[in-house]
A protein has these predicted regions:
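Domain-core and long-helix interface of multi-subunit machines
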Residues: 1-18, 22-37, 72-164, 255-284
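Noncatalytic, beta-rich nucleic-acid-contacting surfaces in large DNA/RNA-processing enzymes
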Residues: 2, 14-18, 161, 237-913
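Hydrophobic or amphipathic alpha-helical targeting/insertion segments
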Residues: 29-77
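Phosphate/diphosphate-binding loops
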Residues: 42-45, 53, 161-166, 174-216, ...
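Histidine/acidic-residue-rich catalytic or RNA/ligand-binding cores of hydrolases
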Residues: 51, 137-139, 163-173, 313
Length: 913
C-alpha cells in the first residue's frame, strides 16, 4: 500500500478513498500512510447486496461507526433487510453500476430497488467507472438513469493496482487465495492509477467536481481514542480498593513490611498508578490471576517489565520482589510517557482458554475480543506460491528454497548475499522466471491469523467502536495490535506456557506420592541445583536446552541465581560475545573494570559488564542526575535509534554529568559506551522472572527427577518434539529406567512405579485414550492372569487383532514372560479362543470363572531382537526396551557434543566411521 499511496502523491492527488470488500481491514494502514504523505483520506466499505455493489463513505465519527455496523451486518448475511434512518447525513453512498446486476433491469425497477435499500441516505451517487477498455454505451445508459431519477454521478474508478502491468500481481494473489492455477505471466489491466489528465479525459466535468464535493463533505478523523478502559466491578473506588489490596497483599508476603524502603516504594507506585488512571487495569489483571490460583491453574512468576512493580508483587500478579533484585518501576510504567503499561501473564498452556472464558463471563462477551494478525508473503513462501500457481517443477522450487537458507532475507538481498541462490538465478532460466514472479508478490498480505496471546477489553461493547470478524467460533478484531493500542483499547497478553503445564503435572505427581512442595518457599541458592546445571543435563529446562547454553553454563561455572539471570540476558546474538569475559572476570582471570568508580554498585553484580537496560537507567541517574522516568526515556531513545530525541538527551546527559562534577570528555566516553551496549541491553525484570521459572524446574529435576521426566515426557507425547531422544539419553545417564507400556498398568500418561517410568498405552499408534480408559476398567477387576486371559477379557471392548499386534510390538505384553515372536504367532488362536471364552465372562466382575473351556497351547517362535526393536520403533516412535547405542555415554564433564538437530543451526554436521 505504501507504494500506491506514494504514487498517488506523486501524481498530484490531494484526496483518496479506500473501500475494502465488506470489511475495514486496510483502514489503519491506509489512514497512517495518507497522513504521512499529507493526503486527505476518506474511509469507506464495499457492501454487496443481492443485486448491487454499494460503497459507503464515513462523513464523520457517527458515519464511521455505521460502517462498522454495516461490516457486521454484511458478514451475518442480513444486509438485504437493513434499512437506514431517514435523512442520514453521516454516510455517503455510491452505487457501482458496472458491478451491479440490477442496472441491467428496466429503469423503474432499478429505481425501486435503490429506493428500497438506500432511501434513508441523504446523499446517494451513481458511480461512473471508465477504464481504457470500457464500453461507452452502458456508461451513457447509467448517466441517463441518474439524470432521470435525480442521482448525481461521480467519477468513481476502482483502483486495484498502481500500473497497468501490475494487473498480473492481482491475478496471482487471487489464484493463491482461491487455490487456482494460472498460465499467463504478464497482463495489462485497466484498473490502474490514472493520471489527472486521464481522469479529465474519461469523465464529465461535473462528475469530477462531485469527487471534490465528497472530499469536502467527509471530515472524519481516524486518529482519535475510541477505546475505554474497563472499570473493575466493585462497590468502592478503584483507587481505594487498589491501595487496600496492595497493603494487604504486601503484608502477607515474606518480607519486613515495616521497612521504609517498602513503604516508600509502595506509596510512590500507587500514587503514579492513580495519577495515570490505571488502577482498574491492575485490579482486572490481579482478579483473573487470583481466579487462576483459586482454580489451581499454574501461573508464571512474571513476564516482561511487570516484575519491576512492587504493586504487582503485592497483588499477586508477579512472584518477584523487585527490591532485592534492584528492579525499576519506571522500566515498567514511565509516568512521563503516560502510556498503558504491559502486564503480560503466563498460564499453563492447557488452561489458557479457561482464563479467557472467565474474563468473558465476568465482563461480557461483547467487551472481549481476540486480535487479528496478518501474515505477509516472505521470500520462501513467495517461491512456493509461484511454484504451485504456475506448476513449476518441484526440483526448481526445492533448489531455490534450500538456497534461501533460513529465509530471513528478501529475494533482492538473497541474490546479493547468497551465492547458491544467485547461481540458480543466473544459470537456470526456470529458476530465474520463478524468482521474477515471486518478487512481484513478495511483501503482500497472504492471510490473516489470530494473535497467540493478546485479547482486548473495553468498557463499552466493542462492536460499537471497532470492526470485528468471526474466525471460526471466535470473534477477532479487524485491526492489528499496534493500531488498537493507538486507539486506546486495553490489550492484555494471556500466554499459554508449556513449561508451566510441566511444573503443574510434576507437582501433581508428587502430591500423589504424598509429597507437598511449595515452589515459593524453595531455597533459591541451592548448590545441588547449580551442580546439575554445570553438568549440562539441561534437557527440559526452560531457556537452557540448547547446546550453546549448556556450554555457557559450564563456561561460567554457574553457582548462584544471579548467574542464571545474567545468562538468560546474555545468551542472545551480540551479548553472548560477553559470556567469556563474564566467566573470566567471575573466576578472577580478567580484571573487573568499571566505567567510573561511582558506578561500581550498579555494575558490580555483572562484573563491570553492562547487561541490563536497568543498568543504563541507573547510570544515567547516577552520573547525569536524571530521574528514573527521564532515564527510561534516555534508554528508549538510544535503543530505538531515535536520533532527534537522542541528540537532546545526549546533551542533557553531558550537561548533567558536568554539573555533578564529571569532566566532559569522561562523560562523553561513558555516553559512547552506553551507546555501544544499548542494542544489547536486556530487560532485567523479565530475566529475573524467567530465571525464577527456570530455577524452579531445575529444582524439581534435581530432587524429583522421576516426576520431572514423567511430566516432560507427558507434555511431549503426541507432539513432534525433536528433543525426545535427548530426554531419553539423559534418563539413561541418570540411571532412571524408562520402561515399555505395561498392560497390567494401563495408563494414558507416563507414570512412576518403583522409581521407574512406564510409558502409556496411548504412545502406540491407533490406541486412543478412550480405549485405554475402558481397558483400565477391565484391569480394575483383577490382574490379567496370562496372555489368553488378557485377550479374552478385552474382547468385548473391540480390542482388535491390530490393537493386540501393536501392544505386543510395543512390549506391553512382555509382563507375561513370553517372547514377542511367540505372542505374535499365538495371536490368531488367542482371538479365536477369546470369541468363545468371552461368552463365559462374569457380567458383574468381567472375569472368567474358575472352570471354563480348556486353554489352547501357545505357538512357540524364536525372537529376533533387532526385528523386535524395529517393530517397537514403528509403533511407539521410540525404543524403550534397550539402548541401540549400547554403553555409549557422553563424558560427565567433557565437551558438549551437539545433536544433529542442534547442529542444523550451523548447517554443518561431521560424522566419523
Amino acid at each position: 500500500m505504501d507504494r500506491l499511496i506514494s504514487a498517488i502523491k506523486e501524481k498530484g492527488y490531494s484526496t483518496v478513498g479506500l473501500a475494502d470488500h465488506q470489511v475495514l481491514f486496510g483502514v489503519p494502514e491506509f489512514a497512517t500512510l495518507t497522513k504521512k504523505h499529507q493526503i486527505q483520506s476518506i474511509i469507506g466499505i464495499d457492501i454487496v447486496y443481492p443485486k448491487m455493489l454499494v460503497t459507503f463513505f464515513a462523513v464523520n465519527e457517527l458515519g464511521y461507526r455505521e460502517l462498522i455496523q454495516l461490516s457486521h451486518i454484511a458478514q451475518e448475511g442480513l444486509i438485504s433487510n437493513h434499512r437506514f434512518q431517514s435523512k442520514n447525513k453521516n454516510i455517503i453512498a455510491v452505487v457501482s453500476p458496472l458491478q451491479s446486476s440490477i442496472f441491467k433491469e428496466p429503469f423503474d425497477q432499478l429505481a425501486l430497488y435503490l429506493n428500497t435499500h438506500l432511501s434513508g441516505i441523504a446523499l446517494t451517487y451513481v458511480g461512473i467507472e471508465n477504464y481504457p477498455d470500457s464500453d461507452e454505451k452502458p456508461i451513457q445508459l447509467y448517466r441517463e438513469f441518474a439524470k432521470k431519477y435525480s442521482y448525481p454521478t461521480v467519477a468513481f474508478p476502482h483502483i486495484r493496482y498502481g500500473k497497468p502491468n501490475d494487473a498480473i500481481i492481482l491475478d496471482i494473489l487471487q489464484a493463491i487465495h482461491r487455490g487456482e492455477t494460472l498460465t499467463i505471466k504478464e497482463k495489462l489491466g485497466g484498473q490502474y492509477l490514472p493520471t489527472l489528465e486521464e481522469i479529465q479525459q474519461r469523465y464529465l466535468p461535473e462528475e469530477i467536481i462531485e469527487t471534490t464535493n465528497i472530499a469536502n463533505g467527509c471530515r472524519f478523523n481516524f486518529f482519535v481514542k475510541r477505546g475505554q478502559l474497563l472499570s473493575f466491578q466493585s462497590g468502592t473506588s478503584s483507587q481505594d480498593l487498589l491501595r487496600e489490596k496492595s497493603i494487604e497483599g504486601l503484608q502477607s508476603r515474606p518480607i519486613d513490611f515495616t521497612q521504609m524502603a517498602y513503604l516508600e516504594r509502595l506509596d510512590y507506585e500507587l500514587t503514579m498508578i492513580e495519577q495515570l488512571g490505571f488502577a482498574d487495569y491492575f485490579l482486572i489483571v490481579a482478579d483473573f490471576i487470583q481466579y487462576a490460583k483459586q482454580q489451581r491453574i499454574m501461573v508464571g512468576p512474571g513476564r516482561g517489565s511487570a516484575p519491576g512493580s512492587l504493586v504487582a508483587y503485592a497483588l499477586g500478579i508477579t512472584e518477584i520482589d523487585p527490591l532485592p533484585h534492584q528492579l525499576l518501576f519506571e522500566r515498567f510504567l514511565n509516568p512521563s510517557r503516560k502510556t498503558m503499561p504491559d502486564i503480560d501473564t503466563d498460564f499453563a498452556d492447557k488452561d489458557r482458554e479457561k482464563i479467557i472464558e472467565y474474563i468473558r463471563k465476568k465482563y461480557g462477551d461483547d467487551r472481549v475480543s481476540h486480535i487479528i494478525t496478518y501474515q505477509t508473503i516472505q521470500a520462501k513462501q513467495a517461491i512456493r506460491d509461484i511454484g504451485r500457481v504456475y506448476k513449476f517443477s518441484n526440483t526448481s522450487i526445492e533448489l531455490l528454497s534450500k538456497a534461501l537458507g533460513d529465509g530471513k532475507l528478501d529475494l533482492r538481498s538473497s541474490y546479493k548475499k547468497l551465492p547458491a541462490f544467485q547461481k540458480h538465478f543466473d544459470e537456470d532460466p526456470e529458476c530465474a522466471e520463478i524468482v521474477k514472479l515471486a518478487h512481484k508478490i513478495e511483501g503482500f498480505i497472504r492471510q490473516s491469523g489470530m494473535h497467540a496471546a493478546g485479547i482486548i477489553l473495553n468498557e463499552t461493547p466493542l462492536h460499537q467502536s471497532l470492526p470485528l470478524i468471526k474466525q471460526g467460533p471466535k470473534v477477532i478484531t479487524q485491526y492489528e495490535m499496534n493500531h488498537l493500542e493507538a486507539q486506546g483499547f486495553l490489550k492484555i497478553d494471556i500466554l499459554g506456557l508449556r513449561n508451566l503445564t510441566i511444573i503443574e503435572t510434576c507437582l501433581n505427581q508428587l502430591n500423589h506420592q504424598g509429597i507437598q512442595l511449595d515452589l515459593k518457599t524453595i531455597p533459591m541458592e541451592d548448590n545441588q541445583v547449580f551442580q546439575l546445571l554445570r553438568t549440562g543435563l539441561n534437557m527440559g529446562l526452560f531457556q537452557l536446552e540448547s547446546d550453546g547454553m549448556k556450554r555457557a553454563m559450564k563456561t561460567i561455572q554457574i553457582d548462584r541465581f544471579s548467574d542464571l539471570v545474567s545468562l538468560i540476558a546474555l545468551y542472545r546474538p551480540g551479548p553472548m560475545d560477553n559470556i567469556e569475559s563474564y566467566a573470566r572476570r567471575k573466576q578472577g582471570l580478567e580484571p573487573v573494570t568499571y566505567l567510573d568508580n561511582q558506578l561500581k554498585p550498579i555494575l558490580n553484580p555483572t562484573f563491570g559488564i553492562i547487561i541490563y537496560q536497568e543498568q543504563i537507567m541507573q547510570i544515567a541517574q547516577t552520573m547525569a542526575g536524571f530521574s528514573l522516568a527521564k532515564a527510561d526515556d534516555f534508554r528508549r531513545a538510544i535503543s530505538k535509534k531515535d536520533n532527534e530525541t537522542m541528540l537532546a538527551l545526549k546533551q542533557s546527559f553531558l550537561d548533567g554529568a558536568v554539573s555533578k562534577g564529571y569532566k566532559s570528555d569522561h562523560a562523553l566516553s561513558v555516553y559512547n559506551h552506553i551507546l555501544k551496549f544499548a542494542d544489547y541491553g536486556f530487560n532485567k525484570s523479565h530475566s529475573v522472572a524467567y530465571a525464577t521459572l527456570t530455577y524452579q524446574m531445575a529444582y524439581l529435576k534435581t530432587y524429583h527427577p522421576d516426576a520431572f521426566y514423567a511430566s516432560i515426557l507427558n507434555s511431549s507425547a503426541g507432539t513432534s518434539d525433536t528433543k525426545l531422544m535427548g530426554y531419553m539419553d539423559e534418563l539413561r545417564t541418570l540411571k532412571i529406567k524408562l520402561m515399555p507400556p505395561n498392560i497390567q498398568t494401563p495408563s494414558t500418561q507416563f507414570i512412576i512405579q518403583d522409581h521407574q517410568l512406564i510409558a502409556p498405552l496411548t504412545l502406540l499408534k491407533g490406541i486412543h485414550p478412550e480405549l485405554v480408559l475402558r481397558i483400565q476398567k477391565v484391569r480394575l477387576q483383577g490382574p490379567f492372569a496370562d496372555f489368553f486371559d488378557c485377550v479374552t477379557r478385552l474382547y468385548p471392548l473391540d480390542v482388535t487383532l491390530q490393537h493386540h499386534s501393536s501392544l505386543i510390538d510395543a512390549g506391553a505384553y512382555d509382563v507375561f514372560g513370553l517372547p514377542r515372536a511367540t505372542l505374535r504367532a499365538s495371536l490368531q488362536n488367542a482371538m479365536k479362543n477369546a470369541a468363545i471364552q468371552s461368552t463365559f465372562l462374569d457380567e458383574q466382575t468381567g472375569l472368567l470363572p474358575p472352570t471354563s473351556l480348556p486353554k489352547i497351547p501357545m505357538v512357540e517362535a524364536e525372537d529376533k531382537p533387532f526385528e523386535n526393536l524395529e517393530k517397537e520403533l514403528d509403533v511407539t516412535g521410540m525404543i524403550l526396551s534397550q539402548s541401540v547405542l549400547g554403553n555409549y555415554r557422553q563424558p560427565k564433564n567433557g565437551p558438549v557434543i551437539p545433536t544433529i538437530q542442534e547442529s542444523k543451526r550451523t548447517n554443518q554436521v561431521v560424522t566419523t566411521g
